[in-house]
Regions:
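AAA+ P-loop NTPase nucleotide-binding core of proteostasis motors
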Residues: 1-382
């Protein structure tokens, strides 16, 4: 226990008086010894008071490490998301559709399918050797496939960074396949581990996103079969990497042309018939079976089809994008108000059925963020 210098000095004064008292007693100076005894009592009382005041101040400044902080530290060290367990896991899974649909607009059916699959998984109805879930997202560009994966990572594992994204256009050649699990002995990069296995080893609780899986070399698919079936991969250093606590998602544009051609035949946004959806899914699955091998498709938890976005969906997406800009401006002390006419103007200039929501984001940047940036730099705002 480290005491302040004042208390150490008070104890030293007491020790000195005690020595003087004992010396006086030995020399039979009883009157002097009695005076020193009274002085010792006063010094001890003074020191006790100082000690009590010091303890009181120390307790007021004491830093308490509680359970939540310990969970946060362990989560940072291990990558296991312990610090978001304040909400019951069961309730989080029951509310998963609502949470996902609040961020991913126009894909209610996709959100429902993935939520049902994850509930089956967490209810111990899945094979414990396999990942939590493995999904193939099919649909045209700009409809929210990657956004759903990112949102799912945040909702399931408590942070936006709980996603490992791998662009499969980097693995189109045969010689690039080894980079997934690491270069063999004697080759450059052998000691670094694989670009996939090393990230999963460091973050075992995460969403693993393989973007545009149809571009990957066939040997990459063969490599992934073990992760999908057995929930593990062995890297070039001989370490077994556990995939059982991951959610594996692969995105693809296979069948996107079918969606565009059939927008008016059962897959229009205004039509929500399960029968029409199943018909279109059957046609898209024919395309998918031509692109991927049966042993790969059989190992997936589910294949999820994303519909094209309608103009009504764009209104909701504009609201989300404008709210993001308003929140950033609020941090700068600026309040942004965008009326309905301006929001409609953004939709009209950013709506493109073929390219989905991405042109809308560029419209928000061009028509809203650019003028705001210039006004802030010129200090030309109220």
């Amino acid at each position: 226990l480290n005491l302040p210098p004042e208390l150490d000095k008070a104890q030293a004064d007491i020790d000195a008086v005690v020595l003087q008292k004992e010396d006086a007693s030995r020399h039979q100076k009883f009157e002097e010894a009695a005076n020193l005894r009274d002085q010792e009592k006063k010094l001890r009382a003074k020191r006790e008071k100082m000690l009590e005041e010091w303890r009181k101040k120390r307790d007021e400044k004491r830093i308490v490490v509680d359970e939540d902080e310990m969970l946060h530290i362990v989560a940072d060290w291990t990558g296991v998301p312990l610090n978001r367990m304040e909400k019951k896991e069961t309730q989080k899974l029951l509310d998963l559709e609502t949470d996902l649909q609040g961020s991913v607009i126009g894909q209610e059916r996709a959100c429902e399918v993935i939520a049902r699959a994850l509930r089956r998984s967490r209810a111990d109805l899945k094979d414990p050797r396999r990942p939590i879930g493995s999904f193939l997202f099919l649909g045209p560009t700009g409809v929210g496939k990657t956004l759903l994966a990112r949102t799912l990572a945040e909702r399931m594992f408590g942070e936006k960074e709980a996603i490992i994204q791998i662009d499969m256009s980097e693995y189109m050649e045969k010689f690039t396949v080894s980079r997934m699990i690491g270069s063999p002995p004697g080759y450059v990069g052998h000691d670094e581990g694989g670009q996939l296995t090393e990230q999963v080893r460091r973050k075992p609780y995460s969403v693993v996103l393989f973007d545009e899986i149809e571009k990957a070399h066939p040997d990459v698919i063969q490599l992934l079969l073990q992760a999908l079936e057995d929930g593990r991969l062995t890297d070039s250093l001989g370490r077994v990497v556990d995939f059982r606590n991951t959610i594996i998602i692969m995105t693809s544009n296979v069948g996107a042309d079918v969606l565009q051609r059939n927008n008016s035949v059962g897959f229009d946004v205004g039509v929500d018939s399960t029968r029409d959806y199943e018909k279109l899914k059957e046609r898209i699955m024919d395309e998918t079976k031509r692109a991927f091998k049966p042993e790969f498709l059989n190992r997936l938890t589910d294949i999820i089809i994303f519909q094209q976005l309608a103009k009504t969906h764009m209104t909701k997406i504009v609201d989300i994008e404008v709210d993001k800009v308003a929140k950033r401006l609020l941090d700068l002390g600026v309040k942004l108000v965008v009326n309905e006419a301006a929001r409609g103007y953004l939709v009209d200039n950013g709506w493109d059925e073929k390219y989905g929501a991405r042109p809308l984001r560029r419209a928000v940047e061009r028509l809203l963020e650019d003028p705001l940036a210039e006004a802030i730099l010129r200090d030309d705002y109220n």
